[in-house]
Amino acid sequence: MQSNATEHAALERVAPRGTALRIAHAVKRYGEREVLYGIDLEIAPGEFVAIVGRSGCGKSTLLRLIAGLEGIDGGSLHRDGAAGGGLHDDARVMFQDARLLPWKRVLDNVALGLPRTHRAQAAEVLAQVGLAERAGEWPARLSGGQRQRVALARALVHRPRLLLLDEPLGALDALTRIDMQNLIEGLWQRLGFTAVLVTHDVAEAVALADRVVLIEDGRIALDARIDLPRPRHRGAPAFARLEEAILNRVMQRKADPDEVTDARAHVARPSPWEVSAAAVGWAV
């Protein structure tokens, strides 16, 4: 089987078919405690946005609002120009836990919710994630990375226009994690869906995203466009500068946002940076 890295390098991005998102002045409360307030964010169809921030800052809460798993307490959320509310058939969420059914074989896990006549579609998507030969096996026989591939196939078999990723790779070893990042990026380029990723890993955010958004204490503190060419090389000086600048901003709340802008100025393909709390782009 051809390596993911080789396949990834050869892919060209298709025309986006993803969901457009617009969040304005969003507020979320639990009792009297506000966990999100003043969130303003727009995500273009087919855009890949990564959300970073410390634990408890509100990243996953925002993801649940976008997914329709929880209601918004103030402001508005629109999908493709229409007010969003509740679960949508064209959106799927992938979690850190693959949540496979142990009593169903791999192909049956991918085909959950599909008519029996669509099993060929499930087999096709399983092949896209590199596991066609494991279709008849039980989930218990798979590695952690393979289980996440099955979970990804189960999400993509429904042909979502919006894929929400809530720390899906956090429990994987470093090499498997990079392999999965390449797979996700390649499928995103090929299929054109909108992707929103919540992650604690700044390197992962820089590797995958068109934009990296930092949330601090329920507010957007940084929105940085990543204009590095794809596929991205972690050892490249421009990549390292961006990763370090964003990580410093995450870890040192009073750090100067201009540090991120300065790092961006060294990238070979210059373009304007958007670093503000008003021009937001959020993600899982």
From Swiss-Prot:
Part of the ABC transporter complex SsuABC involved in aliphatic sulfonates import. Responsible for energy coupling to the transport system. GO terms for cellular component: plasma membrane. Pfam families: ABC_tran. GO terms for molecular function: ATP binding; ATP hydrolysis activity. This is Aliphatic sulfonates import ATP-binding protein SsuB. InterPro entries: AAA+_ATPase (IPR003593), ABC_transporter-like_ATP-bd (IPR003439), ABC_transporter-like_CS (IPR017871), ABC_transporter_ATP-bind (IPR050166), P-loop_NTPase (IPR027417). Signal peptide: none annotated. The lineage of its organism: Bacteria, Pseudomonadati, Pseudomonadota, Betaproteobacteria, Burkholderiales. Its main location: membrane. Keywords: ATP-binding, Cell inner membrane, Cell membrane, Membrane, Nucleotide-binding, Translocase, Transport. It is a peripheral membrane protein. It catalyses: ATP + H2O + aliphatic sulfonate-[sulfonate-binding protein]Side 1 = ADP + phosphate + aliphatic sulfonateSide 2 + [sulfonate-binding protein]Side 1. It is found in: Cell inner membrane. Gene3D superfamilies: P-loop containing nucleotide triphosphate hydrolases. It comes from the Bacteria. The complex is composed of two ATP-binding proteins (SsuB), two transmembrane proteins (SsuC) and a solute-binding protein (SsuA). Belongs to the ABC transporter superfamily. Aliphatic sulfonates importer (TC 3.A.1.17.2) family. ATP binds at residues 53-60. Its EC number is 7.6.2.14. Residues 21-242 form the ABC transporter domain. SUPFAM superfamilies: P-loop containing nucleoside triphosphate hydrolases. It is an enzyme of class 7 (translocase).
